[in-house]
Regions:
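Conserved catalytic cores of phosphodiester-cleaving nucleases, focusing on short active-site segments
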Residues: 74, 103-130, 149
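Charged, glycine-rich intrinsically disordered N-terminal tails and low-complexity linkers that flank
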Residues: 1-65, 69
Length: 220
């Protein structure tokens, strides 16, 4: 079981989210976010740095606007799941309240009654290395996010991640869309979840004690 902060607007959501460690923060803490280091994150959490507003970036707006249609497609393609969606609710670990997150949806598998998480990602494929990040795996920063959500509550037994990959063909001037689904089982990653929890406990200590953590260079 875990605690839920029930919120119905974006302003309150941003306020409560900033007080803890969210899903997108996990990769920064482990040095797996190519765009932000753990030190950048610490400076934001301690008020030394204003987080960059990325809400008006085209890729961010696309991902936000695409989420609901992709969620509805998932519901059509996977009728074996009950899908629950609360856009602003913040889910918090019962004992470690700073470990928190807002899910793209919660799932219940009808046959087994197991609880899970649904996560949605959109990504542009611009070069061959971008394909490799999605080949039989998910990118490291998204994997850290899934582990973080597993850390919120051990009752979440799986995560279904839906990825829509967009590729521009310069020769034909056409867009190709590739949809991938990944099923991640909690029990397959127990050591990774425990490791992440310990690292987030350490990072939270640096925040609470206003101590600068050692820099972890992001993996590019």
């Amino acid at each position: 079981m875990h605690n839920i902060i029930e919120i119905n607007n974006i302003v309150d959501w941003l306020k409560y989210r900033s007080k803890g460690i969210g899903g997108s923060d996990a990769a920064c803490i482990l040095g797996r976010n190519p765009h932000k280091s753990n030190l950048d994150l610490w400076r934001e959490k301690t008020g030394r740095k204003i987080p960059e507003d990325i809400s008006n970036k085209d890729v961010v707006k696309y991902g936000k606007n695409a989420e609901e249609p992709l969620r509805q497609l998932f519901i059509l393609d996977y009728p074996q799941y009950i899908v629950k969606y609360s856009p602003f609710n913040i889910h918090c670990n019962k004992e470690l309240d700073f470990i928190r997150g807002t899910f793209d949806a919660e799932l219940i598998e009808i046959l087994t009654e197991e609880q899970g998480i649904w996560e949605c990602k959109t990504s542009e494929i611009r070069q061959a290395s971008d394909w490799q990040k999605w080949h039989n795996r998910i990118p490291d920063n998204y994997f850290c996010q899934v582990l973080h959500y597993f850390a919120i509550d051990e009752d979440y037994k799986f995560c279904k991640l839906k990825a829509q990959l967009k590729h521009y063909d310069l020769d034909s001037n056409e867009i190709t869309l590739t949809t991938k689904h990944y099923h991640l089982k909690r029990d397959d990653y127990l050591p990774d979840i425990e490791y992440l929890i310990n690292e987030e406990i350490k990072f939270n200590w640096y925040i609470k004690n206003d101590k600068e953590p050692p820099l972890i260079l992001p993996v590019m």
